[in-house]
Amino acid sequence: SKQISDRVDGMLVLPPVTVGYSGHYDSFPFSLTLSYDTTTQVIYDLIESVIRNGITHIFLMNGHDGNIAPIEIASRKIKEKYPEVQIAALTQWWVAAGNLLPKDTFEVWNGLGHAGEGETSIAYYLFPEWCEPELATCVIPSLPDEIDIKWDFSELTDTAQTGDATKASAEKGKK
């Protein structure tokens, strides 16, 4: 966001919302979550606060799968109440990144996963001191592309990680 705002005159970047809906991770220790209703309301209230300050072009960037539905609902409600406001959202940056980067950037599952190849590569690039590559694992769940199956994360993995973090690199993260 900071790099983009440096190139776009007049762009305001707000601090990230660091807690949202994570109920599907509740089977793992220390998973913090807000309800769907609370998450939706927080997003709605923040957008409405920005609108009250005269901002009419809003772009939301999401970094967490649990917030996709709340962002969709909040932004739709905002558009209904404030039809003059232009609002757009990138609700799944991880899918967009895998699709926009050269096809050979990621080796497994198009870089997808929770702490998978893509996210871990970004961490290796931005925060190498926080990373422990020796703990990287590979868990590729068998999920259909055509249907959105609802699952608890513990049904997919026993580590809270999916994708192939063993293929991650700082070079991929820089891209």
Regions found by a protein language model. Name each.
Residues 1-59, 63-175:
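Extended, histidine- and acidic-residue-enriched regions that form the cofactor-binding/catalytic faces
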